[in-house]
Amino acid sequence: MKLPIYLDYSATTPVDPRVAQKMSECLLVDGNFGNPASRSHVFGWKAEEAVENARRQVAELVNADPREIVWTSGATESDNLAIKGVAHFYASKGKHIITSKIEHKAVLDTTRQLEREGFEVTYLEPGEDGLITPAMVEAALRDDTTLVSVMHVNNEIGTINDIAAIGELTRSRGVLLHVDAAQSTGKVEIDLEKMKVDLMSFSAHKTYGPKGVGALYVRRKPRVRLEAQTHGGGHERGMRSGTLATHQCVGMGEAFRIAKEDMAAENQRITALRDRFYRQLEGMEELYVNGSLTARVPHNLNLSFNYVEGESLIMALKDLAVSSGSACTSASLEPSYVLRALGRNDELAHSSIRFTFGRFTTEEEVDYAAAKVREAVDKLRELSPLWDMFKEGVDLSSVEWAAH
């Protein structure tokens, strides 16, 4: 077993060796290095063929038409293109948007920007289980609502929203639905023939593909219109200009092909690993699972260890690569905004650790990690005067602390 152990698969995944092999064939002079937009020679035609094959592979994972897949640089760009693109195009119909408080920053910062431009945004509060329900969305709908944006799987707590039901509601009310699915490809079944979703964002690097490439699904029937955010050569049917990186697109296509093939078996294996890990911690005092344990992807376990500061626990677990909060906000010492929205107090939000498992995680690693976590938590609690007070039966919420 090699140390440190990587248990942060929701931040990024390593590229699958099969993906790396396919990508390497699109780089060198004797490989498929051409510009897919070069229409006058065989190098361009071959590159275009590879890119279109990859587009088909992405579409097949989510049961979409390849013509509905637009290449982007990642899910952040896809979220921006979908939300700003729709808001601006349909602004004459209305300027009200609905999203949730626990979306990824790529969605929240985009809606904040639209608020500065005069749009009105309603931020839904999830239940304690971390889920956004159709009833919550329905209660917020107005006559001037043009877009609802709700994530499929939450990046911090791994909860799965019932997108099919939310889609039935939005379609019946003539409102467009955007879904950030960066964390769900290869983990949850997605069928865009059945789901009434209008726009969906994807990322390659959360699914064992390369960083720097993603895609946006844009429904053709009924047709969704977007205002482009990047202008140039009119690539991707005018929605997203810029020379396509053949090797990146091919990498994402291969990653999604493997995801489609291996998803059922992989989910079974990873569920067993997560449950094995959790069983070894379950008996600990003041241990809380954040988010629903049932409506959740197998890869994620987000735990709060009360009376232990999350950052100090991460430092104590130097052999484990884990995180508190999402990778995009893990540099901030603020408590997780996702856990605060679930109703967790600051102390519990601060004491949370996200463990995420993946394709290359082994049983041996999981057992080692669980033992290390128990050891570190016990040690840090021994040092904590708050833990002593709690053990003595002091109600810490009623203590009036002296100010300095």
Swiss-Prot record:
It comes from Ectopseudomonas mendocina (strain ymp). HAMAP family: Cys_desulf_IscS. Homodimer. Forms a heterotetramer with IscU, interacts with other sulfur acceptors. GO terms for biological process: [2Fe-2S] cluster assembly. One of its GO terms (molecular function) is cysteine desulfurase activity. It catalyses: (sulfur carrier)-H + L-cysteine = (sulfur carrier)-SH + L-alanine. It holds the Pfam family Aminotran_5. Pyridoxal 5'-phosphate binds at residues 75-76, 155, 183, 203-205, 243. The gene is iscS. The active site is at residue 328. Coiled coil: none annotated. It is found in: Cytoplasm. This is Cysteine desulfurase IscS. Pathway: Cofactor biosynthesis; iron-sulfur cluster biosynthesis. Its main location: cytoplasm. Its EC number is 2.8.1.7. The modification N6-(pyridoxal phosphate)lysine is found at residue 206. [2Fe-2S] cluster binds at residue 328. Master enzyme that delivers sulfur to a number of partners involved in Fe-S cluster assembly, tRNA modification or cofactor biosynthesis. Catalyzes the removal of elemental sulfur atoms from cysteine to produce alanine. Functions as a sulfur delivery protein for Fe-S cluster synthesis onto IscU, an Fe-S scaffold assembly protein, as well as other S acceptor proteins. GO terms for cellular component: L-cysteine desulfurase complex. Belongs to the class-V pyridoxal-phosphate-dependent aminotransferase family. NifS/IscS subfamily. Its cofactor is pyridoxal 5'-phosphate.
